[in-house]
Amino acid sequence: MGEMKRIISVSRRTDIPAFYGNWFMNRLKEGFAGIVHPFGGRKYIVSLKPEDVVCFVFWSKNFGPFLENLRIIDDLGYKFYFNYTVTGLPSVFESNVEKQLAIETLKQLSRTYSPRHINWRFDPIIISSICDRDFYIKAFEQLASEFAGYVERCYFSYVTEYNKVKVNFEKLQKTKGVRIVDCGDDFKIQLANELAAIAAHYGIQMYSCCGDYLVEGSRKEGYPRIKKAHCIDGSIIESLFFPEGLQYTKKPTRKECGCTESTDIGTYDTCPHGCVYCYANVNKRKAYQAFSNHDKDSAFLGYSKAESDRWLAEIQKSKFKYQNYISKCKSSVLTHDIGKDKP
């Protein structure tokens, strides 16, 4: 650990500020976090020491429980900004989200830090039998008017129907009678442009996440331009914290993603928000169970302390073997070079 400074994502995979603040603060105390790669299961550790972290990018639907932690994190010298999701969706899609609390907390963050520290995520947009064009115009207008002066950027996208999301939508139709409507690109472009016009009225710039056709579609005469989103954005970090300049690399996580390279320390299937559209959970029950059973002292979020300690020992053992191998290689090269220098 400590060889390379990283941008740390906290987290796309779960809501750490809302539910796992104690775990995260314990990770800062110990100076590292364990990660299980979601594809392949490789286990590794990443340094969270201040000198090894470029910036934390915090993601949440509820920063309320994390506010005091943020003060401590700030005092420790870390840099950070926020991706704050406030969608305006009906509770049938977000049963455990307190929207008014989210609105007030976003304003508090803006006052404490600055509007430039916050990406407001109006994401995802789901066109359904209860959420049509008129619904979104009204819901977005209400939120944009609330956030005028508190944010400068709004990131949005239309819902991506991954297989697990499709299953949830099918259950929603069977149990609640809510039908998801598959709209064409022309409809989506027109709605996005209307939202961009509302945003501009309140001094907010719209950014399209993984939807370049919406950026192109905003070039219609009479509408404000929609820009390409970079949810983890090296240029935002540079403008906030590094006036002397910052080197960073783009590393998309999926098609048309504009994100800067980062390391995510979250774990899938651990978020108890229970949002129907979530791609990070297989099902609500599994996520609730993971949250109920989580160990704040484990290095790996969502896993037991016993598992964590075993994996840390294995990683350390592997690292020790690797260091010995490198040392032997260097020694061999050095001996060879000395021999060559002899007359």
Model region roles, listed by residue range:
Residues T263-V282:
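Local cysteine-cluster metal-coordination motifs and their immediate loop/turn environment
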Residues G88-N96, P124-D134, T175-G184:
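Surface-exposed cleft-lining segments at the edges of enzyme active sites
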Residues M4, D182-E244, S292-H294, Y322, ...:
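Flexible, acidic/Gly-rich N-terminal and inter-domain linker regions that tether
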Residues M1-S9, P17, K49, G222-Y268, ...:
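N-terminal [4Fe-4S]-dependent radical SAM core
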Residues K317-P343:
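Short, basic, low-complexity termini and linkers enriched in Ser/Thr/Gly/Pro
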Residues M1-F93, K99-P115, N283-K321, V333:
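Conserved Radical SAM active-site core
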Residues L101-N168, E194-G211:
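Conserved C-terminal portion of the radical SAM core fold
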Residues R13-D15, K61, T85-L89, D123-I125, ...:
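Active-site beta-loop-alpha junctions enriched in small/polar residues
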